[in-house]
């Protein structure tokens, strides 16, 4: 099994709205992350290659599992070292990531 990691680089106090173009199993997606100061957390929207929302405005909390029939794998959002604290605007880009596993062909 191979684990893939998608880091949230460039997401910080000066850049609170970011988009990442990601290819998963020959499908193109755009992950939009937006920090909400009122809630003090990030929200995620995922669009497919046709710019249709697959996932819309879910809070990025540690341990989040994203499962959808338009995404071929379960995507987990978590702290990269397995810690249990929640992301902040100061640590989200350095310490949190999306992860998904693909079975290796034998």
Residue ranges, per PLM feature:
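Short, charged/polar N-terminal "headpieces" of proteins
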Residues: 1-32
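Residues that cap or initiate secondary-structure elements
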Residues: 12, 28, 37-39, 50, ...
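Short beta-strand/loop motifs in extracellular/secreted proteins, especially
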Residues: 18-20, 42, 96
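Short, surface-exposed loop and linker segments with low hydrophobicity and enrichment for Pro/Ser/Thr
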Residues: 24-40, 89-90
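Acidic, aromatic-enriched beta-alpha/helix-loop junctions
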Residues: 35-83
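C-terminal low-complexity, charged extensions that often adopt amphipathic alpha-helices
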Residues: 77-106
């Amino acid at each position: 099994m191979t684990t893939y990691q998608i880091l949230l680089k460039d997401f910080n106090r000066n850049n609170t709205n970011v988009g990442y173009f990601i290819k998963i199993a020959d499908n193109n997606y755009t992950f939009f992350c937006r920090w909400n100061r009122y809630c003090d957390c990030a929200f995620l929207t995922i669009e497919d290659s046709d710019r249709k929302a697959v996932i819309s405005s879910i809070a990025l909390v540690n341990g989040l599992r994203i499962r959808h029939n338009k995404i071929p794998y379960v995507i987990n959002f978590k702290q990269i070292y397995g810690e249990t604290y929640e992301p902040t605007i100061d640590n989200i880009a350095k310490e949190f990531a999306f992860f998904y596993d693909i079975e290796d062909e034998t």
